[in-house]
Amino acid sequence: MNNRTDFDVIIIGAGPSGIFCAYELIKERPSLNILMVEKGRPIEKRVCPKRTTKVCVGCRPCSITTGFAGAGAFSDGKLSLSPDVGGNLPDILGYDKALELIHESDDIYLKFGADTKVYGGDKQKEIQEIRRRAIMANLKLIECPIRHLGTEEGYKIYTRLQEHLLSSGVRIEFNTMVQDILIEDGCASGIL
């Protein structure tokens, strides 16, 4: 990493949270000087020997869990499109705001090439029958539409997102581990 110290925003980690943080910042305030620091590699350099050898060789850093897009880069890529699953965001922001943000995130994935098909909402008759059986068994069925990215398409989507951030002026320092966050007068002022 060079010695430049005049960044407006420093984002630690290039997983989905870091990616979407940078995306929103450049959309809302394109003049910001943004640095993203990631301990792993760029997406195009994330290669795991285990794919061919079938044995983990203990790479440091691990290309499966670190690098641009984080652990999700090589996952099956299923996006849950309901606030009813996945955590307590609705409790924090309210149900409607959580749903709005899920749709906003989904729109970004669509913009960068996600398949438009959504699974789980087209078989209402079958869903009603499963719901009836669940109630009879004292269970609650939670409907959750799913957008399936797929491993290969997810990789392409994240590659396009990486290119978008770079071409929009976000500086990404790969293979860089943050050791500490500098605090001055109670505010984050930099990183080591």
Residue ranges and their predicted role:
Residues 42-46, 50-168:
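Conserved N-terminal/central alpha/beta ligand/cofactor-binding core
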Residues 36-38, 82, 143, 172-175:
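General beta-strand structural signal in soluble alpha/beta enzymes
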